[in-house]
Amino acid sequence: MAESLPVSSCRLLIIEDEYVIAETLAEALREAGANIVGVIRWLDEATRFASNHAGEFNCAVVDINLHGALSYPLIDMLSSQGVHVVLLTGFGVEALEAAYRELPRCEKPFNQDRLIGMLCSKFGA
């Protein structure tokens, strides 16, 4: 088990359409001390969850492309709720819409330690 990192205040929603990536990420983040509130693979399901559970999570790792649907409206919703968003994407920064280029992101294939480091910078002691 990985050493506990200062992400214990992170109540995290993972929104990723690739099952293996989502589950691997969830396990690594749990080991780092994050509280995973959900792992969701579909944009419409994630949008409903965000609407119905606002305030129950404070961070989301969001894949930009979920089964061919771009997640920008969901990212806007999460941001308006005060949720810290980290993008997980196979796109380079130049492929992102301009409004989203400054958000923290990990490009696929991603490095788990880098992603955990991003969360630590948001929720660290």
Can you say where each PLM-predicted feature lies in the sequence?
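Alpha4 helix (beta4-alpha4-beta5 surface) of REC/receiver domains from two-component response regulators
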Residues: 72-73, 80-81, 91-108, 113, ...
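Acidic, metal-coordinating helix/loop segments flanking the phosphotransfer/catalytic sites
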Residues: 39-59
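CheY-like receiver
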Residues: 49-52, 77, 118
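Conserved acidic carboxylate
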Residues: 16
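Non-catalytic signal-transmission and effector/linker regions of two-component phosphorelay proteins
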Residues: 1-13, 110-125
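Two-component/phosphorelay signaling modules centered on CheY-like receiver
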Residues: 19-38
